[in-house]
Design a protein with these regions (language model features):
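Domain-level signature for soluble enzymes in the chorismate/prephenate branch of the shikimate pathway
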Residues: 1-89
């Protein structure tokens, strides 16, 4: 791989990172709305069934090569979301 090619690939990765950051912020904003709803209705932060459904969908939609990493990514993202939801008053 030539250095120029590496720079181009890294620029593309930076672009993807920028898109992912925007989506992350949007997801956290929605998580805050979920937290407010759950608090107003005396519901727990954790919804195991919802998490299982999300992970099953991720597993079904991800190629074998990336599946374990996608699942790990989504588990971590859901953990962060739960932590954040706990801070919502």
């Amino acid at each position: 791989m030539e250095e120029l090619d590496l720079r181009q690939i890294r620029r593309q990765i930076n672009d993807v990172n920028d898109e992912m950051l925007k989506l992350f912020v949007r997801r956290m904003e929605l998580s805050a709305k979920v937290a407010s709803y759950k608090k107003a209705h005396n519901m727990p932060t954790l919804d195991r069934k919802r998490e299982e459904d999300i992970l099953q969908r991720v597993a079904n939609c991800t190629e074998d090569e990336y599946r374990q990493y996608a699942l790990e990514f989504f588990r971590y993202m859901m953990d962060i979301s739960k932590q954040y939801q706990e801070t919502i008053k």
